[in-house]
């Protein structure tokens, strides 16, 4: 998708806020705890390269989802450790090895395929993933883990880390969390090795279970000023939202009562109204179910009326405004704010998904 840099619609990212959020979390963790910043999915829509460069003096390393995301960081000059959290097909391991990118080992089947590779990958750095109750990837039996370690030593891979992922660290009920923590400790008790990093804490665990961290945490959406729990658990400290989404009015008109607006002619003006058009739509991540949400114009809430189109929305204004008038879809204008969480509430999802839905067509402006 081509970035629309000649359009007034853009995402603005406050990199200083991200750096300050990082420090805010770290001050609440035990001394000597290290952190990998999670910059997968283009840093949750905020811009992976820019975020990684900003955090290069704070983070011990970075987590990504796949090899291509890791390559993007390496090509941008990021030399920190990079851990791929997903499973990398073994045929691509030589690329990871060449660029010193750490991969996740999650099954004996994968290891057998790695053994069959006709390539010397000695020194490849790996992290062993344990499935303690998340149910996605990872070793579930101690015997399988021990066998995996033996194979890794035979292949002369460097076992840099062992980790798991909690499924319910952001919820009120903690029985499943405690069960996962107990299972993880049982695995650790029989480890015949001492990896550099042992990690289980995502953002939620680092925030609400700081006493259970090991020597490394993985900080994700909290860095971007988002609450991992949505509205379920309150944050024990303040963070700054790092992303705002703005555009401009490109067309404005006064319509008489009974005028229809948008596809399906679903909106009918009830009186003489000022209607403005803003160049953003569902192709940018403004999904159609956000119809009826308000945006901010001159510090005033203005409702999105009519169906959201692929590239445009229409909003109802309190009065006439000139072309070029700023429109805030996420962020602050005057004393009013529209948050990512408000979008999530409107469409029945989580704040993570909202920022990840914002497409690459939207230019990221770093401030």
From Swiss-Prot:
N6-(pyridoxal phosphate)lysine sites (modified residues)? 40
**Which residues span the membrane?**
none
List the GO terms this entry assigns under cellular component, sorted alphabetically. cytosol
State the SUPFAM superfamilies in the record: Alanine racemase C-terminal domain-like, PLP-binding barrel
**Which BP terms in the Gene Ontology apply to this protein?**
D-alanine biosynthetic process; peptidoglycan biosynthetic process
For this UniProt record, the keywords arranged alphabetically read as follows: Isomerase, Pyridoxal phosphate
Which Pfam families does its entry note? Ala_racemase_C, Ala_racemase_N
The protein's matches in CDD domains, at most eight in alphabetical order, are given as: PLPDE_III_AR
- Gene3D superfamilies registered for this protein in UniProt: Alanine racemase, Lyase, Ornithine Decarboxylase, Chain A, domain 1
Lyase in keyword set: no
**Highest taxon of source:** Bacteria
Reaction catalysis annotation: L-alanine = D-alanine
- Write down the InterPro entries for this protein, in alphabetical order: Ala_racemase (IPR000821), Ala_racemase/Decarboxylase_C (IPR009006), Ala_racemase_C (IPR011079), Ala_racemase_N (IPR001608), Ala_racemase_pyridoxalP-BS (IPR020622), PLP-binding_barrel (IPR029066)
What pathway annotation does it carry?
Answer: Amino-acid biosynthesis; D-alanine biosynthesis; D-alanine from L-alanine: step 1/1
Q: Where is the active site?
A: 40 (proton acceptor), 263 (proton acceptor)
User: What positions does the entry give for substrate binding?
Assistant: 136, 310
The EC number(s) given in the record are: 5.1.1.1
- What role is this protein assigned? Catalyzes the interconversion of L-alanine and D-alanine. May also act on other amino acids.
- Please identify the protein, giving its name as recorded: Alanine racemase
Species the sequence originates in: Streptococcus suis (strain 05ZYH33)
Organism lineage:
Bacteria, Bacillati, Bacillota, Bacilli, Lactobacillales
């Amino acid at each position: 998708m081509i970035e629309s840099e000649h359009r007034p619609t853009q995402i603005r990212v406050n990199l200083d806020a991200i750096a300050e959020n990082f420090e805010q979390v770290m001050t609440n963790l035990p001394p000597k705890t290290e952190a990998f910043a999670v910059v997968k999915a283009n840093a949750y829509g905020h811009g992976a390269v820019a975020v990684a460069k900003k955090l290069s003096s704070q983070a011990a390393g970075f987590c990504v989802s796949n090899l291509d995301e890791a390559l993007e960081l390496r090509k941008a000059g990021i030399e920190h450790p990079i851990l791929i959290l997903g499973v990398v097909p073994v045929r691509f391991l030589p690329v990871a090895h060449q660029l010193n990118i750490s991969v996740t080992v999650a099954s004996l089947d994968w290891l057998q395929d790695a053994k069959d590779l006709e390539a010397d990958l000695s020194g490849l750095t790996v992290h062993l993933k344990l499935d303690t109750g998340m149910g996605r990837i990872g070793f579930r039996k101690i015997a399988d883990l021990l066998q995996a370690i033996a194979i890794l030593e035979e292949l002369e891979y460097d076992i840099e880390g062992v980790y798991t992922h909690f499924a319910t660290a952001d919820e009120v009920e903690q029985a499943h969390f405690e069960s996962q923590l107990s299972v993880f400790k049982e695995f650790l008790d029989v480890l015949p090795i001492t990896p550099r990093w042992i990690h289980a804490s995502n953002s939620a665990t680092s925030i609400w279970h700081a006493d259970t961290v090991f020597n490394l945490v993985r900080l994700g959406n909290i860095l971007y000023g988002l609450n991992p729990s949505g509205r379920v658990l309150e944050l024990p400290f303040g963070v700054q939202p790092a992303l705002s989404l703005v555009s401009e009015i490109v067309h404005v008109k006064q319509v008489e009562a009974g005028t229809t607006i948008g596809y399906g002619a679903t909106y009918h003006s009830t009186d003489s109204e000022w209607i403005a058009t803003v160049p953003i739509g569902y192709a940018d991540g403004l999904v159609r179910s956000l119809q009826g949400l308000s945006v901010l114009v001159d510090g005033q809430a203005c409702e999105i009326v009519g169906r959201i189109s692929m590239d445009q929305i229409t909003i109802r204004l309190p009065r006439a405004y000139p072309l070029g008038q700023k429109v805030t879809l996420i962020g602050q204008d005057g004393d009013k704010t529209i948050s990512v969480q408000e979008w999530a509430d409107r469409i029945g999802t989580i704040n993570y998904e909202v920022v990840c839905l914002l497409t690459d067509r939207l230019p990221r402006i770093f401030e």
